[in-house]
Amino acid sequence: MRRAFGASLPTDEELAISREITEFDRTLAFFDGPDVVATAGIFSYEMTVPGGRLRCAGVTRVAVLSTHRRRGLLTAMMRRQLADVHERGEPLAALYASEAPIYGRFGYGLATYQTALEIDRPHGTFAQTLSGNGRLTMVDVPTAVPAFTRVWEQARQSQPGMLGLDERWIRNQLADLELHRDGASPHYRVLYQLGDDPAGFAIYRIKMDWDASGPNGTVRLGMLIAATTEAYASLWRHVLDVDLMTRITAEMRPVEEPLRFLLADSRQPRTRVEDGIWLRLVDVLAALAGRRYAVEGQLVLGVRDGFCPWNAGQFELRGGPTAAEARRTTASPDLELDAAALGALYLGGNRFGTLHRAGLIREVQPGAVARADAMFATDRAPWCPSHF
């Protein structure tokens, strides 16, 4: 995989970190003689969906050497993976795409978005004075792992798109490899506690620089996760107050970042929207029944799925805020769409109306698009803040 992405071979430290999370029984490889020429893997996750949680296969480490392109290796691995996911009863599969055009043909749709942001520190003043009873402390990795794991579990309860991470995975997210520093410092790990209870954390680096006018450093925020509004504001205040810095940068932030409304200068932060995770419904019935819906409603969806033919057909969905059920039906569909479009819509990060105007949904029954948008609406935009 490293060769296919133009990277150097992994160090012993990288291999040790990778080995702890690798599921070798879910790892595929093509060989040409003794040489590995294509790879794909899966991590077994649980994803928060609107109103619930579902098992999700995290597709990862997908690569084909340039010498072996256009031979069907990627298609064969995708087909093998999705058959395995289906056999294991995982309703969802998700991935990050190195190139956007690749995965739509396999039924993946762009389901979440994220932002990269930059803030000029002089414009980082809050509109109101911060109040709170919590405390911030710098922590080492042994302290951070259990505390950050507790925070993560609390935060993901209400955040569609977040994946469940145990201590093994939090330790992986805390890995502080030299190749990731790009001239910046080692990690700073900050824990926010209310009493003895962890409620938020931030991980960042600082890149020190000087010019003729003085210090000109950058805070590179790697992750900020908070289970309470107080923890969120306090952690951002800390990041914005690091001495000798003139700017703060961050990636993989939510599109609905409350920080903008905390700042006196609402034109900060400057943001760039990027694609997040691509989602595929591997079991349409289980996925539709496994989430909850903003309003009570009924829809018949006609789904086209050439890559996973067990998903093709008409599905009647009845759901609301407290319960949902789905079943196959022979009734005429209200809407017709393919698997990739359904994946893009499932978490609520895109609107049926938008995809309808793009020609990706056929509205058979008038008013069905508006009804679907009302049902699939969420109070939070989906967000996945972890790499895999």
Where are the regions that the model predicts?
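Intrinsically disordered, low-complexity, positively biased terminal segments
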Residues: 3-7, 32, 128-388
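A conserved beta-turn-beta hairpin within the catalytic core of GNAT-like acetyltransferases
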Residues: 47-58, 69, 209-218
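N-terminal membrane-targeting/anchoring modules of bacterial envelope and secretion proteins
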Residues: 11, 28, 36, 40, ...
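N-terminal, Lys/Arg-enriched amphipathic/low-complexity engagement segments
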Residues: 8-20, 25-29, 39-47, 51, ...
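Conserved acetyl-CoA-binding loop-helix of GNAT-fold acetyltransferases
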Residues: 59-86, 228-240
